[in-house]
């Protein structure tokens, strides 16, 4: 049985408060996009699970892979046979696209459906939350306003980017998330929340729908700012960094012709949003 875990983008990201526990509360819109990995399972005649990962390299030992953490989380509640697991990675890691979290949540759903486990999406989302703050998003996989640590979701009725073209570029730059939070120049609520701005025409988002990480990370990594401007030069209605990076995305009316010389060393992907 095979599924295709998809990525997400952040539409705006406001860091609204630093908490007493050292973490930060955020306000952001999560939107699913059709950039996918592939995840397949079958029962194996053995005493333990086996995970094989192919495609885009990921920097994690097998036991630390979120797919395996998802399997073990379900094993604590249900009894099911050992699995052979094949994960083919297309979503780059360390990009702000939620690839690892998506893999974990899709693994939960895949095992649930494969073995007809008696657990609904709400219970599955609760398990997903123990793996990562944004993992529950991929259980429902619909546009939401994410608040608190990014795990409290408010649906966004009638909000859709369907029909727009999207381009993603990720340079070979690694962003340490903890360091990115530490370097923030703005922490606090802004006048307008992301879920209000996204209902405006996309052409009006520029300058309003802000990712707070850009202010601190762009001076440190000028290449990120250059790529964002390249997306605008290529005709983007809106362009931004996703999460704490280092992937950037642009939204377009027509299929864009990107500056190939500017992205020769980048991961790049384009599609139409369904």
Swiss-Prot record:
It holds the Pfam family GHMP_kinases_C. Its EC number is 2.7.1.148. It comes from the Bacteria. Signal peptide: none annotated. Keywords: ATP-binding, Isoprene biosynthesis, Kinase, Nucleotide-binding, Transferase. InterPro entries: GHMP_kinase_C_dom (IPR013750), GHMP_kinase_C_sf (IPR036554), GHMP_kinase_N_dom (IPR006204), IspE (IPR004424), Ribosomal_Su5_D2-typ_SF (IPR020568), Ribsml_uS5_D2-typ_fold_subgr (IPR014721). It catalyses: 4-CDP-2-C-methyl-D-erythritol + ATP = 4-CDP-2-C-methyl-D-erythritol 2-phosphate + ADP + H(+). It is an enzyme of class 2 (transferase). Pathway: Isoprenoid biosynthesis; isopentenyl diphosphate biosynthesis via DXP pathway; isopentenyl diphosphate from 1-deoxy-D-xylulose 5-phosphate: step 3/6. GO terms for biological process: isopentenyl diphosphate biosynthetic process, methylerythritol 4-phosphate pathway; terpenoid biosynthetic process. One of its GO terms (molecular function) is ATP binding. ATP binds at residues 92-102. The active site is at 8, 134. SUPFAM superfamilies: GHMP Kinase, C-terminal domain (SSF55060), Ribosomal protein S5 domain 2-like (SSF54211). Catalyzes the phosphorylation of the position 2 hydroxy group of 4-diphosphocytidyl-2C-methyl-D-erythritol. Belongs to the GHMP kinase family. IspE subfamily. This is 4-diphosphocytidyl-2-C-methyl-D-erythritol kinase. The gene is ispE.
